[in-house]
From Swiss-Prot:
Membrane topology note: Multi-pass membrane protein
Protein name, per record: Taste receptor type 2 member 41
One Gene Ontology molecular-function label: G protein-coupled receptor activity
Cytoplasmic side: 29-40, 110-129, 205-234, 286-307
A Pfam cross-reference name: TAS2R
Organism: Gorilla gorilla gorilla
Highest rank taxon of the organism: Eukaryota
Transmembrane domains' residue ranges: 8-28, 41-61, 89-109, 130-150, 184-204, 235-255, 265-285
Alphabetical UniProt keywords: G-protein coupled receptor, Glycoprotein, Membrane, Receptor, Sensory transduction, Taste, Transducer, Transmembrane, Transmembrane helix
Cellular component terms per the entry's GO annotation: membrane; plasma membrane
Keyword Nuclease belongs to the record: no
Note: Most taste cells may be activated by a limited number of bitter compounds; individual taste cells can discriminate among bitter stimuli.
Function of the protein: Receptor that may play a role in the perception of bitterness and is gustducin-linked. May play a role in sensing the chemical composition of the gastrointestinal content. The activity of this receptor may stimulate alpha gustducin, mediate PLC-beta-2 activation and lead to the gating of TRPM5.
Length: 307
């Protein structure tokens, strides 16, 4: 890839990362302020603040890793820093996947019009489970991180006491990253993705049928209620697309199909981090509380800039 084109993709990745960190940070600050003021949060806000915190940290860790690795490839590839980065990245990525899944389940039980007794029972019970599910997600992510640490323990040990040669460390990393990690990551990420997929498809189907029923009963496309359901459908479909893109990108990334030396590395990193950078804006504009605060901040910034 030409140097100018690579610089363009690096700049695009940087801008996307800054926007993602800013949007996720905004969600955390707004909801954190409300938490401090009232001493509690609604189940939806609990998930949003957890998701915003994990996504922002994940985006920050990924950005630092990509630019540090591109600047010091040889030293970083065989050093201890790379191993510790992966531990942080696996923890944050796993937590983010689970938080997204619980967000889709909460949307489903709150909005979907399904009369099955099991669904009605879940609709009643799920909001009360949210704090424990979030805590459980953090615990699961920590256990998964320990699992990766255990698999990589010989590398950490030998890097610390300097018995491995750089070549032997590289061979060990290549072996476990080629044969062990891809299958392990596929299993770990497929569980929350399956939960997400089932709940989001149930919700999309319910909203689609409800919108068609409203149009059949004489509601026009310009009717406020119809427009609200149409906007909700578009938001959910966008969420589904971004989450699926993130899942597929991470699975392919786990196979090391596209390495740092590959010409398409930076475009690929844009695809990997697209969901955690773009979806926060969808959440902000679809949430009345976050949207109103966002416009207030923009007006304040505009007034400060003009002054």
């Amino acid at each position: 890839m030409q140097a100018a084109l690579m610089a363009f993709f690096m700049l695009l990745f940087s801008l996307l990362s800054l926007l993602g960190i800013a949007a996720n940070g905004f969600i955390v600050l707004v909801l954190g302020r409300e938490w401090l003021r009232y001493g509690r949060l609604l189940p939806l806000d609990m998930i949003l603040i957890s998701l915003g915190a994990s996504r922002x940290c994940l985006q920050l860790v990924g950005t630092v890793h990509n630019f540090y690795y591109s600047a010091r490839k040889v030293e970083y590839s065989g050093g201890l820093g790379r191993q510790f980065f992966h531990l942080h990245w696996h923890f944050l990525n796993s937590a983010t996947f689970w938080f997204c899944s619980w967000l889709s389940v909460l949307f489903c039980v709150k909005i979907a019009n399904i009369t099955h007794p099991t669904f009605l029972w879940l609709k009643w019970r799920f909001p009360g489970w949210v704090p424990w599910l979030l805590l459980g997600s953090v615990l699961i992510s920590f256990i998964i991180t320990l699992l990766f640490f255990w698999v990589n323990y010989p590398v950490y040990q030998e890097l610390l006491i300097r018995k491995f040669s750089g070549n032997m460390t590289y061979k060990w990393n290549t072996r476990i990253e080629t044969y062990y990690f891809p299958s392990l990551k596929l299993v770990i990420w497929s569980i929350p993705f399956s939960v997400f997929l089932v709940s989001i498809m149930l919700l999309i189907n319910s909203l689609r049928r409800h919108t068609q029923r409203m149009q059949h009963n004489g509601h026009s496309l310009q009717d406020p209620s119809t427009q609200a359901h149409t906007r909700a459908l578009k938001s959910l479909i966008s969420f589904l697309f971004l989450y699926a893109l993130s899942f597929l990108s991470l699975i392919i990334d786990a196979t090391k199909f596209i390495s740092m030396q590959n010409d398409f590395y930076w475009p690929w990193q844009i695809a990997v981090y697209l969901c955690i950078s773009v979806h926060p804006f969808i959440l902000i504009f679809s949430n009345l509380k976050l949207r109103s605060m966002f416009w207030q901040v923009l007006l304040l910034a505009r007034g400060f800039w003009v002054a």
